[in-house]
Amino acid sequence: MKAVLLISGGMDSLVTTAIAAEEKLELAAMHVNYGQRTWQKELECFRRICNHYQIRHRLEIEAGYLAQTGGSSLTDPAMPVSGADLQGTDIPTSYVPFRNAGFLSMAVSWSEVIGAGKIFIGAVEEDSSGYPDCRQVFYDAFNRVIELGTRPDTAIEIVTPLISMQKCDIVLKGMELNAPFACSWSCYKSEGRACGVCDSCARRLRAFELTGVRDPIEYEVRPKYI
């Protein structure tokens, strides 16, 4: 069976790729540039991940409309990226309105064309308090949308292997599968060295701290988050 992987270049999409690779599927990879601050580094990591797993069927898509519509510190340089708030429940400034729905729509379109039966995405429910499109209920609903909005003979399923995992468990799973964490990027702000203080860096650093393993990427600072 063919499967499409949505690969941002981040830690979660890396481990999702490692899991999919274990299933011996025919893999195709999609990356979306939506005008995010770190798009060059993310694209570099996407390509490195694909090279590592020998994924040759790739699609790199421009989705600049998400930057044009605005509303997120990831795409609007005038909006500051929020610092780490690991206990907060408010939606952070890094939320890109309805982003994952757009990504999934593009992935479904491509899957129909190439005959893929699965779409893998590295969504994590742990983040759902800040990101409403990272919840299992969202993906359950989108599977129904696919069923209603594609040809009758189309059978495409969204797969979320990390959805119920904690970040530290994702690190452990990646280590178990020998995922190349050095090929991934999570920072919202920087493309040289990861900042270490944005929400995404904090979640990643805390996950590695909890496992007792040092994150292999370079940081400007490495605060303690546990």
Curated annotation (Swiss-Prot):
The gene is queC. The keyword Ligase applies. Catalyzes the ATP-dependent conversion of 7-carboxy-7-deazaguanine (CDG) to 7-cyano-7-deazaguanine (preQ(0)). It holds the Pfam family QueC. It catalyses: 7-carboxy-7-deazaguanine + NH4(+) + ATP = 7-cyano-7-deazaguanine + ADP + phosphate + H2O + H(+). ATP binds at residues 7-17. Pathway: Purine metabolism; 7-cyano-7-deazaguanine biosynthesis. GO terms for biological process: queuosine biosynthetic process. Transmembrane segments: none annotated. One of its GO terms (molecular function) is ATP binding. It comes from the Bacteria. This is 7-cyano-7-deazaguanine synthase. Binds 1 zinc ion per subunit. Keywords: ATP-binding, Ligase, Metal-binding, Nucleotide-binding, Queuosine biosynthesis, Zinc. Zn(2+) binds at residues 187, 195, 198, 201. CDD domains: QueC-like. The keyword Cell division does not apply. Its EC number is 6.3.4.20. Belongs to the QueC family. InterPro entries: QueC (IPR018317), Rossmann-like_a/b/a_fold (IPR014729). Its cofactor is Zn(2+).
